[in-house]
């Protein structure tokens, strides 16, 4: 029996992307910090194969992957029918049970989760959800589209170009020649649609460039090439939409040539400095560009805007926007918000309020 006094919040986690493991940990932060006096919490895991299971797993079981084997898991779907406005559960006894859902937290990273696909389903269902909408989620996920929009908005960015699989397969040497001529060495090679530094390589010569392209194509059908920026990485948390509010940036002290997936989530060698080691004027400049980029790409709810600050020139250049940033214990977004005076439980409350307010404005 659902409580009429509490909001029913569904936390989605897992997914079919290469960032499945990170999502499980991020979702655990929400599960552990949602106020049970205010919310009825349901957790729904999406396996790597794409099965949706309603589970009573703890955050520890979610993180280590053992949640999938729990005997109480029930297959479920989000109904696109607005009359249902929620979940459909398929019980072990063969019954079909409908649950009203007030808001969804899509704690999903990468493709088939952070790219607007799940958001479109929730829009069809008329269910409020935390974070950016369909358009912003899709364009921020595609680095080539995002870069083009940054250029159009006048937000500084390093030199770049992109190529699709068919272009590469038909003329690999021509694609390499174009990238070398425009960008010089070294070149960062990235899948257009991936996050958490998955599939990214720093190429120093032609052989490495070809290997990097092959790796990127394992993760996406489109490849982005970017000129190397000799600088350090800083990140801003942005929240809201009317107006967007950016925090003071924090700084990543990476343990490798660039901020790798392992640095972020496995080997623990990266460090975070808040605020970033910049002048007050430069801190404000980063904040300004973060709010500009967030607004230009139609972001709502929350996002993390990542920048480079070039050594020597001190020039600020945007790298990318993450529309559902990590919420792991080492993730920058919650650390930045806490530094501004908003601890995780209060942050979650605010994000839910923003989700409900957006739906109210859209649909009345």
Label each PLM-derived region with a short phrase.
Residues 152-191, 201:
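Rossmann-like NAD(P)H-binding beta-loop-alpha module
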Residues 144-153:
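Structured adenosyl-cofactor binding patch, chiefly the S-adenosyl-L-methionine
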Residues 2-7, 13-16, 36, 279-364:
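ATP-dependent carboxylate activation and anion-phosphoryl transfer catalytic cores
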Residues 150-151, 179-198, 221-230, 234:
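ATP-grasp fold ATP-binding core
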Residues 1-135, 139-141, 145, 164-177, ...:
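ATP-binding N-terminal substructure of ATP-dependent carboxylate-amine bond-forming enzymes
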Residues 201-288, 311-317:
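Phosphate-binding site of ATP-dependent enzymes
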Residues 41, 128-129, 157, 187, ...:
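Hydrophobic beta-strand scaffold residues
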């Amino acid at each position: 029996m659902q409580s009429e006094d509490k909001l029913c919040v569904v936390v989605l986690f897992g997914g079919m992307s290469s960032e499945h493991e990170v999502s499980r940990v991020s979702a655990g932060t929400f599960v552990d910090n949602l106020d049970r006096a205010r919310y009825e919490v349901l957790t729904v895991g999406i396996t790597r194969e794409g099965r949706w299971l309603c589970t009573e797993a703890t955050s520890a079981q979610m993180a280590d992957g053992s949640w999938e084997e729990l005997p109480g898991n029930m297959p479920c779907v989000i109904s696109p029918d607005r009359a249902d406005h929620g979940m459909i559960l398929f019980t072990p006894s063969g019954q079909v049970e409908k649950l009203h859902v007030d808001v969804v937290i899509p704690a999903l990273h990468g493709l088939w989760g952070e790219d607007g696909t799940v958001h479109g389903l929730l829009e069809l269902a008329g269910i409020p959800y935390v974070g950016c909408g369909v358009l912003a989620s899709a364009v921020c996920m595609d680095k080539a589209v995002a870069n083009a929009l940054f250029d159009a908005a006048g937000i500084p960015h390093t030199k770049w170009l992109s190529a699709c699989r068919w272009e590469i397969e038909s003329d690999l040497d021509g694609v390499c020649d174009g990238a070398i001529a425009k960008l010089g060495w070294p070149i960062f090679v990235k899948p257009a649609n991936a996050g958490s530094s998955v599939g990214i390589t720093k190429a120093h010569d032609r052989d490495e460039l070809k290997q990097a392209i092959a790796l990127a194509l394992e993760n996406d059908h489109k490849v982005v090439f970017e000129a190397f920026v000799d600088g350090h990485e800083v990140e801003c948390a942005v929240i809201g939409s009317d107006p967007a509010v950016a925090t003071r940036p924090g700084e990543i002290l990476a343990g490798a040539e660039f901020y790798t997936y392992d640095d972020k989530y496995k080997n623990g060698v990266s460090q975070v400095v808040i605020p970033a080691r910049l002048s007050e004027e430069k801190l404000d400049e980063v904040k300004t560009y973060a709010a500009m980029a967030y607004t230009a790409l139609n972001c709502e709810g929350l996002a993390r805007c990542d920048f480079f600050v070039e050594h020597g020139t001190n020039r600020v250049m945007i790298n990318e926007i993450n529309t559902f940033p990590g919420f792991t214990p080492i993730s920058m977004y919650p650390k930045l918000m806490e530094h501004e005076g908003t601890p995780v439980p209060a942050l979650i409350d605010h994000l839910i309020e923003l989700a409900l307010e957006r739906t109210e404005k859209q649909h009345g």
